[in-house]
Amino acid sequence: MNRFIIPNQPQYGVPSPTPTRSPESFITDAETYFNQGKLIPAINSYKDAITSNPNDPAVYVALAQVQVFQGQYKEAQKSAESAILLNNDSSMAHAVLGWALSFQGDYLEAETNIKQALLLDDRNALAHAYYVEILVGYSYTPTAPFGAIEKAIEESRVAVDLAPDKLETYRARGIILEATGQYDEAIDQYKKAIDINGNIPDLHLALGINYRVRGFYDLAIAEFTSANALNPNDPNPDLYLSRTYATIGEFAQSMQYAESAVANNPADTNLRGNLGVMYYRNAYWEKSTKELGYVINGGFTEDGTPLNAINLLPDAPRIAEYYFTYGLALSRLNKCGEALGIVRMINERIPTDELAVENATAIVNRCQQNLVQTPIPPFPTSPNPAAATTPTATP
């Protein structure tokens, strides 16, 4: 009797098995997306790779790096911690964890992890580059270790020796040069990093900041615009565009970008303060006092967003600007009781701030004028910026 082997036939109604993609294919996609500046798709592809193979610490590290560039610092921390759980001896995992923690202000723990990374591999160029960023950020805090900037300079040179042509090395050199006031040299380093990958928003933001400090406002605006296009949900490019347009006297555009910044992060009181300043410069007195009132008093927005007040302290010129602009706007509305309260606060808390005291005097003068004349009510629907008393401000 003849026998035939009949191949398995698919059963009706039962789906055919779908070929499973390899984790390597997802990693390739992620790297391609990253090089194109598509950070969110890159993140999603790395996550797909992890779903396909959850036991590769290197993929968690790569994911964490992109998450930092995207500004997802808490998520980057979790990814790096997952890598460490899989391999506690991974120098890169500890390095990226330290890097992610520094962006959250936890510099002590960040430095602990970066030191562990270098203990595991003292020739890890990226760890040295990340250490530069950590130390520079740390140096701006009251608890900064002695010699943080000097150590950052040393670490940046080690990174250059180990990997002179890496994006992270150019970025680290740019950061330390900027921190030491060498803006032209910092610009050169950031441009070299952008030549390697022009699709990382933070690099354009950093380059724009240095152009702005040097007074190259058109170039700064171009870089901030690039950063904004690459990461439209980040309020920082909008904030810097707002301040830069205000510096060159284009107050209508400065107001628009200030509004965009607040839309991106409605709970940031500092952004509310900036918006209040720009409303003032466009002669929207009522709107100005509303936004600046959040800075001085805190409270809740109409949609219930909580906002914390920002105290007026010495050596904080931006905060001082919020306070004296609030006082100026109140005086414009003939609310001189509140306005003079701001004057007293300025004179008591920051008496050596010449700019703030000068504007406090302007508030008093405006209120004295209000006593002897009937103020003409402003027309916020048709502002005349030229008629406003524009406070002098640090750009």
PLM features: what roles do these ranges have?
Residues 37-44, 70-82, 104-116, 139-158, ...:
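Structural signature of tandem alpha-helical TPR/SEL1-like repeats
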Residues 19-58, 62-72, 103, 137-145, ...:
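Alpha-helical segment of the N-proximal tetratricopeptide repeat
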Residues 23, 57-58, 91-95, 125-126, ...:
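Helix-start (N-cap) detector for alpha-helical repeat units in TPR-like alpha-solenoids
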Residues 1-21, 112-136, 141, 155-164:
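Long, contiguous interaction/recruitment modules in multidomain scaffold/adaptor proteins
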Residues 304-395:
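Terminal, low-structured helical/coil segments at or just beyond the last alpha-helical repeat
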